[in-house]
Amino acid sequence: MQSGLMGELLELTLEHVGLVSVAMAIATAMAIPAGILLTRREALRRWVLGFANIMQTVPSLALFGFLIPLPFIGGIGKHTAIVALVLYALLPILQNTLAGIVGVDRAVRESAIAMGMTGRQLLWLVELPLAARTILAGVRVATVITIGTATIAAAIGGGGLGVFIFRGLASVDTKQILAGAVPAALIALAADKGLSWVEQKFWRG
């Protein structure tokens, strides 16, 4: 019985990490280019950031429920869970990408242009390297948020460690709740510390 529980814990932990990894990969691939675009199109900033802010204010369970009826997402299951997690992860990465690039010293930017750099070269060789630490900080925040929010995925059949939590709530079983909550918290802590280490390793001072 004990080995069966450990096996299920391992399976749900891997499932949880998988949900978070896919959602973060999609969110990062969307938010960084969008953040770059917003540095070039100021008129879009209010609308795009406004949408991302709205997604953050919607209660997580409500957002999961709202997405279920949408036919192009896929109803109950992992697809809907991933879409919801992506929407929650967008804002920190988007904001930090924008802040990082906009925050590049104007003198540095002007020097690069004076050297004959094109807009593309300026972005790839100057702005993104200087903004990378800020962008990574946004990814770190989004990752921790996503790990916690992913526990709600079990409510719509998305799996993950939330399965233990919801099962424990239904049966008033504290051990089941802790079996889901503690590993999720440890994963979030490990992700935060790991990304923080990367940040300090490559951008000391």
Predicted segment positions?
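Cytoplasmic-entry segments and transmembrane alpha-helices of multi-pass inner-membrane transporters
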Residues: 11, 34-67, 85, 95-99
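Short cytoplasmic-facing helical segments at TM-TM junctions of multi-pass membrane proteins
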Residues: 96-135, 141, 165
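Transmembrane alpha-helix signature in integral membrane proteins
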Residues: 9-37
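Loop-to-helix entry region at the N-terminal start of transmembrane alpha-helices
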Residues: 11-19, 66-92, 131-132, 176, ...
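C-terminal transmembrane helix and the adjacent membrane-cytosol boundary/short C-terminal tail
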Residues: 42, 98-102, 106, 114, ...
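Short, membrane-interfacial amphipathic segments enriched in basic
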Residues: 1-7, 37-38, 121-124
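Glycine-rich helix-loop "coupling/hinge" segments at transmembrane-helix boundaries
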Residues: 69, 149-184, 203
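Transmembrane alpha-helices
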Residues: 21, 120-152, 178-179, 184, ...
